[in-house]
Amino acid sequence: AIKVGQIRPVICASPAFLERFGRPQDPKDVMTAPIVMSSASSLLTDWQCNLPAGSITLSPKPRLLVSSNQAAINAARLGWGLTRVLSYQVASRVSAGELDIVLQDFEPPALPIHVVYQNTHRIPAKVRTFVDFLVERLERDEALRPAAKGAT
């Protein structure tokens, strides 16, 4: 396996939403905020946060429950509430200023992304070519690079 990057569960909202409702300062602030939640993954419905004293899991009640992460992202972009998705899913929206990541200092550890293949002494040339192509592409992808805390 070759590590090519990492992703993070992130909480984000539109700048207009944050201006109207305020930027959460503590993970517990999400419990009283409007939430847009995707039912697509349990990783995104139970919100794990890291605190100095240890990890906590929040189960916010959604204002809007949607069936896909893309729908949650679109609703958050339109100001419906905070949502939690994976960092690569919102990287372009964050870069464009359409969404802001909040509570970054409380994020759980990043999840590594690997290219996995059967590593034998005789790897077929087609497989090796594809693996090399994939590794090069994924290692260049900004959305899979670690983010500096407080950078987004």
Which residues does each predicted region cover?
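Alpha-helix/helix-capping structural signal
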Residues: 15-16, 70, 88-89
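C-terminal effector-binding regulatory domain of bacterial HTH transcription factors
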Residues: 87-96, 106-152
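Flexible hinge/capping segments at coil-to-helix
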Residues: 1-38
